[in-house]
């Protein structure tokens, strides 16, 4: 193995080690946040499970397009997290302009930046900042129930040879966990917006779809029961 290739391989290995170490060090208290509109704020806890490493934590909220101008503020936006410690991020709605007949969805971003280590610098270890992005669902105060109240109301229609259109008449944003078309596992699905629709691309050769089987992710971030529906 020549020198340049050895250096490249070493850098890759060190990067993976640093990333795995970080991934095992910082954790969030949930995989999604439901903001109850009847409350003043929502919260998310950041935990540093490492016994040795310190991290700089940066947080912000944006929309699906990455626009940081949103109705929410998150505090603290920047702080140090010592080994084995935790801190609570607080999310506050600053306006009254959000729709009251359906959920709104935004994104919480949490970036953990490893603190500089003299030992790591001496060994030329590449330390990597990793960002976690999770959904923030704003649920208006007058909206009763939860996401599982809408999962069996989804409507499916054929939208050409390689597409299925999914319509969601409910007031809840519904994210698929598993989705099968004619028994075929469809990996790329996504979220059906509240009172909106989503087109799902099917792999070539799927053929005419007569029924789908699916489940969705509930308020706790876990998968619900499977349901079979016909495709019109």
UniProtKB/Swiss-Prot annotation:
The keyword Chaperone applies. It is found in: Periplasm. Pfam families: PapD_C, PapD_N. GO terms for cellular component: outer membrane-bounded periplasmic space. One of its GO terms (molecular function) is protein folding chaperone. It comes from the Bacteria. Its main location: periplasm. Keywords: Chaperone, Fimbrium biogenesis, Immunoglobulin domain, Periplasm, Signal. PANTHER family: CHAPERONE PROTEIN FIMC-RELATED (PTHR30251:SF11), PILUS ASSEMBLY CHAPERONE (PTHR30251). NCBIfam families: PRK15208.1 (NF011755). Belongs to the periplasmic pilus chaperone family. This is Chaperone protein LpfB. It comes from Salmonella typhimurium (strain LT2 / SGSC1412 / ATCC 700720). The gene is lpfB.
